Structures are given as structure tokens and as C-alpha cells.
Amino acid sequence: MLPLYLVHVLYPIGLIANLFFGSAFTIQWLLSEKRKTAYVPKAFWVLSSIGAVMMIAHGFIQSQFPMALLHGANLVIYFRNLNIASSYKLSLTTTLVILVLTLLVTTLPFALAAYYYPYMEWMASPNFFHLPLPPPNIYWHIVGCLGLFTFSSRFFIQWCYLEMNNHSTLPALFWQAGFVGGFLAFIYFIRTGDPVNILSYGCGLLPSLANLRIIYKKSRLPKFHSPSCFLSAGEPSGDTLGSDLLRNIKELNPNIHCFGVGGPLMRKEGLEPLIRMEEFQVSGFLEVFCAVFSLYKKYRKLYKAILKENPETVFCIDFPDFHFFLIRKLRKCGYRGKIIHYVCPSIWAWRPNRKKILEKHLDTLLLILPFEKEIFKDSPLKTIYLGHPLVKTIANFQDCNAWKQQLEISDQPSVALFPGSRPGDIFRNLQVQARAFRSSSLAKSHQLLVSSCNPKYDKKILELLDKEGCHNNKIVPSKFRYQLMRDCDCALAKCGTIVLEAALNQTPTIVTCLLRPFDTFLAKYIFKIFIPAYSLPNIITGSVIFPEFIGGKHDFSPEEVAAAIDILANPIGKEKQKYACQQLLKTMTENVITPKECLQAIYAQKNRFYLKNDFIKEFHPKSSRA
């Protein structure tokens, strides 16, 4: 279609196009090797699209109609893979129309050229180096056509997988068709003396072989020991979540073997403990640093046990830093089962890069806070909002009217203190809270009731209160904390889950959190954690429900906390907080998925054998024979 000298001058366009194809497959191969599984990054489709446009131009210039037609069709498929994950996803019908139009536009110039130039070849053999090659016979052309057809069919195979699964991937059949078709085309272009296509199809054999090798190695991994699942919770709050999750799993399959890390609640539900949760009780940067070798030994024990048992599902509940190491190690070692993380790390507060780790390694993320769904709205990671378990716990809580009589506490009005659950937190925060109470207007009219998580700390708590001049006081065991919240006039609580419990019990509350000097330094100057609010009620509502006093000893004083107590002594301030707590509850109970529905979503389709038959029928009516 073009003058011969121009055809030769523009011939390198095909070579440049193959550099883009080569780069696309090289990136795909390297990332697949790193992840130990066939993986397709977005860059693969972008680079392939650029290469396809250049190969279409190369086909026009060199009068190679099949080449232009093939890459025209492939260009539409590349576009579809990029489009399917976007917010402007086109329908399948629209995509098919684009494909037909592309093929027509590609064919039209060749048809016009053939009409005006009857001797034009539709598949010219360039023989760029002028080798003394005789024209290939019909059998060579059959080999070439068969190779090109098989090779080109791989992206149509991929397209079918894409539309069926709504997910961009390159299945094993894609690589098998690519290898067989590429090998036949490679032989054919050697015979015709076409260096661009020799390079293209010759180099194209390498990614196919590399990915088939990865797929073969993956298929040789041991099968799942089913039914079994691993659960890990390193904190008391995680133990509560894990016990509820474990109860639902056991209801669906009573014979499932559940093992891992858990506290007394999870062990009560049938967890076989590899390590007890109590062995993970560390808090703050300094305590974690001192326990790093012990944590490393536990980490090694756990990932080795998981790889040996090979459960189908791994549930990591909260405790993100430890679990992230475990999750990455499992994927690196080729673990193929589902990994679900229960409770999103506070990426909205600090270290937002952890979102990429979640997207890379997890199958599902279970959320307990309503605003977290918005964070992942454009993410490929599947998220399920279960709601916060405290909502249900507090709603079902039955008051014990005689709790004061049991503890020999008078009916005098009270202020409640919740200094924390760990020893370091308790004594740092209790001192600030006691001084604030003593400086407030309620000190003479109210008694001081302190919630204690562990009886072994009670003696030291009473000694500290006496030292601070708070003599009208009593210790209240943690199991009575909800009665305490509902009975007291106001509460001072250490920043944490206890603040959300207070809000759901509609308790007027002030948040305090006195940090160690070292933790304060790291938070301010190393990790630079500066957010509008730190307690969950304030974060969820986006407003200041509870006043917050958080930081080092120079960031706030007991007198400032006392001023906040005096505001809550006013009925107007108290009612304002209670109304805000009611709105918080409404926000937290919208669009919640039940645990049973959650497990159905996790174990959908290929994992149906995990569930009891009645559950299969309930959620998979077409598969009742499974």
C-alpha cells in the first residue's frame, strides 16, 4: 500500500512494538515469580495496548492483513481488561460493538487497496534481509495460519474468563494456547524470513513457559486439610470477636477443626490453642520492642503450623502488626487458602500504606466500623461490614439491679473511672483521672468508683487513690462495668474500646490517655500521628461527642480535665452527649451483614462443602445436590 522505500524505513515500528510487548510480559512474569502465582498488573494491559496500536500500524505498512486484524481484536480485549475495574464500566454488548467496529475499520483499508491494486498481497513476506528463500508452499501457510489462529485465540479465552468472573486474570489455558500457537508461528516466520515476527513469537514463548511452570508448581502443592481453619486473636477484644466468629463457624460445620491463637472465650468455643492469647499481652512501642524475640518465636511456630496443617481458611483478628508479618510469610511460602482479616487496621489514622498490604495479600477484609467501607470503595479487595459486636452485646445486656448491694456500694452519686486494662496504662491514667476528679466540683458530692480488669491490681489501685486524696472510693470488677456506666453521672475513660462501650451505654464521658514520654515522642515526631479525633465515637460521627485529653504530661493537665467534668455536671451538657450517643448507635446499625451471611460470602461456590447441607440450600438453591 506504501512505496517500497517507505516500507523499509518504517519497518522498525514492529520492533519497537515488540519491546512494549516484551516489557509487559517481563513485568507480569517478575511479579508472578514474586507472588508465587500467575498475576496480571494494570501495567501489563497498558503496555500491551501501546504495542498493539504500533503493530496495527506495522500491519498496514507491511501489507500484513492478518497481523493488523489480530492486534486490532486484541486491542479491544486489552481495553476491556482496563475498563472492567473502572468506575465507568461498559456493558458486554457495548464492548462487542466496539470489537466489530474495530475489525471493520481494520479491514476497510485492505479491501480498498485490493480493489484498486489487484496484485497487492494480503500477507506479504518482507524478507527484510533479502535472504535467498523460495516462496513458502501451501503447507507452510497452513502451519502459519494454524499457529496464528491458536495464538490469537488466547486473548479470546482470557476475555471469556474475564466476563465470567468479572476479574482480570490469565488462566492456564491462555498460556497453553500461547505456547502452542507461538511455537507454530515462530517456525512459520523463520521460513518466511520475517525478523519482527521471529523476535515477537520467539520471545513470546518464554513468558508462556515461565507461567506454565508457576502454575505447575502451584498445582503440586499439598491439598487443603479440610475441614479446618486457623484463627488468631492476640488481644481480649479480638478474643470476643473470635469467639462469636467461631460459634458461627461451628454452627455451620460442627466437625470443623479450629486451631490457632485465642483467649478463654475462643477456647471455650472449641479452639485448639497453639499459643494462648495471654502470651501476647504487650502494649506501647517500648514493651513491643522488649518482647520482639518472644514474638518472633511465636510467629515462626504459627506459620510453620499453618503450612503443615494447610487449612482452607486463615482468620487473623485485629492485632495487625503481628498478623501482617504472618500473612506475608504465608503468601511468600505459597499458601493458597483464603486469608481473612477481621477488623481493619487504623489506616485512617496512620500508616495508610498498609492498605496496599491488605489489597495484595487478603481475600476478604471484615469491617466493624461504618466509615471504613468508604475507604475501600474503589479497592479490588472484598470488604464486608459486620457492624461492631459491642452493639449487639450491649443491646442484649441484662441489668443486675442488686449489683451495688453485692459490692457493698452506697447509693451516693458516683463518677466512674476506667483507667485501662494493662498495668502501665492503669497507673498512668488513674493518677490523672483521680487528680481531675479531686479538682472538680463533684469531688465533695460524689463517690469515686474505679473499674478494675484484674483483681491483682486492686490493692495498688486503692493505694494510689489514697495517695491522691480520694478516700471515698470503691473498686468495681470489670464484669459490672456496664451497670457502672449506666448508674454513674459521668465517666473518665482511657482512650480505647471502653470509650465506645460508654457511648453505646449513653454514658456522659471524658476521654483521657496519658502516654509515656517515649511513646509521645514516637507519635509526634516519628510517626506523626495527628488526626482530628482519637476516640471511636468522635471518629465515627465526625464530631466531638466526648472531650479528649490525649498526649504527654505537658499536653494537658488534671485541672483541664476537671473543667470538662464540671461541664458534664450541668444537665444540659449531659443530655447533649446522650443525644449524640443515640445518633452514633443509629449510624452503626445501618447496612450491617450478619455473620452467617458473611461466612456464606467467604465460602461461596467452590467452598460450599465447608457448610452444612441446609446452609447450602438456603444460599445456593440451585446447588442443593452438591
UniProtKB/Swiss-Prot annotation:
It catalyses: a lipid X + a UDP-2-N,3-O-bis[(3R)-3-hydroxyacyl]-alpha-D-glucosamine = a lipid A disaccharide + UDP + H(+). InterPro entries: Glyco_trans_19, Lipid_A_biosynth_N. Keywords: Glycosyltransferase, Lipid A biosynthesis, Lipid biosynthesis, Lipid metabolism, Transferase. The keyword Glycosyltransferase applies. One of its GO terms (cellular component) is membrane. The keyword Kinase does not apply. It comes from the Bacteria. Pfam families: LAB_N, LpxB. Pathway: Bacterial outer membrane biogenesis; LPS lipid A biosynthesis. Its EC number is 2.4.1.182. Signal peptide: none annotated. Residues 226-626 are annotated as: Lipid-A-disaccharide synthase. GO terms for molecular function: lipid-A-disaccharide synthase activity; phospholipid binding. NCBIfam families: lpxB, PRK01021.1. Condensation of UDP-2,3-diacylglucosamine and 2,3-diacylglucosamine-1-phosphate to form lipid A disaccharide, a precursor of lipid A, a phosphorylated glycolipid that anchors the lipopolysaccharide to the outer membrane of the cell. In the C-terminal section; belongs to the LpxB family. This is Lipid-A-disaccharide synthase. It comes from Chlamydia caviae (strain ATCC VR-813 / DSM 19441 / 03DC25 / GPIC) (Chlamydophila caviae).
